[in-house]
Regions:
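Short, conserved catalytic or interaction motifs in soluble domains
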Residues: 8, 44, 76, 115, ...
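NAD(P)H dinucleotide-binding glycine-rich loop of Rossmann-like/cofactor-binding domains
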Residues: 56, 80, 90-152
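Residues forming the Rossmann-fold NAD(P)(H) cofactor-binding site
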Residues: 159
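Conserved S-adenosyl-L-methionine
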Residues: 164-167
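Glycine-rich beta-strand-centered segment in the early N-terminal region that forms part
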Residues: 21-39, 51-94
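Cytochrome P450 core scaffold surrounding the K-helix E-X-X-R motif
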Residues: 42-48
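N-terminal Rossmann NAD(P)H-binding glycine-rich loop of SDR-like oxidoreductase domains
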Residues: 154, 162
Length: 167
């Protein structure tokens, strides 16, 4: 399969599109055909090597942290998902791998996509949405009913807010 792979840290020249082996699901993994992937500041910080002291991946490494797609396989212990389900997910930091034709992710990091949300819109929700939730709820203590301003409302955070307000 094709994937965007980090060969060495630095600028864009350190990463390239190349053929790699398809991932193999672990018992709790979902195997997904990636239809769209989100691009975030963490992705280029990772490529630049700014996170290597924390994550320490073995290079070469498939980049990408969030995606949307269709389930094409499940591990033996998966209970909540089936082949054909439309899902979006945030890949665990130590695994990454969203910038590929297929990705594996633990079922705890996957959610079913709303039927009226397309893959492109859904791919931008997991990382930005979870980051916003953690910031608002855990760091700032925002409570239900309080108002907040969402700057850049067309991204993952705005999409989540729009979805929550529209039912």
């Amino acid at each position: 399969m094709r994937a965007y792979v980090l060969k060495h840290y630095g600028g864009p020249e350190g990463s390239l599109l190349m053929d790699v082996s398809a991932p193999t699901p672990r018992p709790r993994d979902i195997l997904v055909e990636v239809r769209a992937a989100g691009l975030n500041p963490v992705d280029f910080k990772f490529r630049q090597g700014k996170l290597r002291a924390i994550l320490r991946p073995k290079l070469p490494f498939v980049l990408g942290n969030e995606f949307a797609g269709e389930v094409i396989g499940v591990g033996d212990d998966v209970k909540q998902f089936r082949v054909g389900d439309r899902v979006f997910a945030r890949v665990a930091k130590e695994r990454a791998g969203a910038f590929a034709e297929q990705a594996c992710v633990d079922e705890d990091h996957v959610a079913h996509m709303p039927r009226d949300l397309d893959f492109t819109a859904a791919a931008g929700v997991p990382l930005a949405g979870l980051t916003a939730l953690q910031a608002l709820r855990d760091e700032l203590g925002v409570k239900p009913g309080q108002r907040v301003f969402i700057s850049g409302g067309a991204g993952g955070v705005g999409t989540l807010q729009f979805r929550s307000r529209s039912g």
